[in-house]
Regions:
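Binuclear metal-dependent phosphoesterase catalytic core
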Residues: 81-150
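His/acidic metal-ligating clusters that form di-metal
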Residues: 1-89
Length: 150
């Protein structure tokens, strides 16, 4: 429905915001499910395809919408809370979906004990090619690697 409305209104971009990290690839099993980037099937610890996967249908539908939309799409999520901005989504042939950007926010990461609660400023420039730009905002009292100012 989001993409149908964006197309009907001739929107220049779409931003989706979710708590969950659905896992995009095979890169980081400590933070998200491992996932075959072509089939989008979740992998078990032994490397086999999982039979239960709550995100595969969602990701397959999202991939189809991103390809058809052809304009910038940002997926913002927390959950694993490792701050990064990247382009992890591939099409079924293994080509990077260049109009898709994943933004993973700061947060309290229970896996590594980091209470990295900061915030992210998003700028929207409808006439720019990428539309969205991002600027991390560090809260001085929440610094974990560099001591907070006295």
């Amino acid at each position: 429905e989001t993409f149908a409305q964006a197309k009907a209104q001739n929107s220049v971009a779409v931003m989706l915001i979710s708590q969950a990290n659905p896992g995009w690839d095979l890169s980081d099993p400590t933070r998200a499910p491992l996932r075959d980037p072509l089939t989008l099937k979740e992998k078990t610890a032994e490397g086999a395809d999982s039979t239960t996967d709550g995100f595969q249908d969602f990701l397959l539908a999202l991939r189809g919408e991103v390809v058809a939309f052809r304009k910038p799409v940002a997926y913002v999520h927390g959950d694993s809370h490792y701050f990064r901005i990247d382009k992890p989504f591939l099409d079924a042939s293994g080509r990077r979906l260049e109009n898709f950007t994943r933004v993973e926010t700061f947060g309290n990461n229970q896996a590594n004990g980091t209470n990295d609660v900061q915030w992210l400023k998003v700028m929207v420039a409808p006439r720019s090619r990428e539309v969205f730009s991002y600027q991390p905002q560090i809260v001085p009292a929440n610094r974990v690697a560099v001591p907070a100012p006295q």
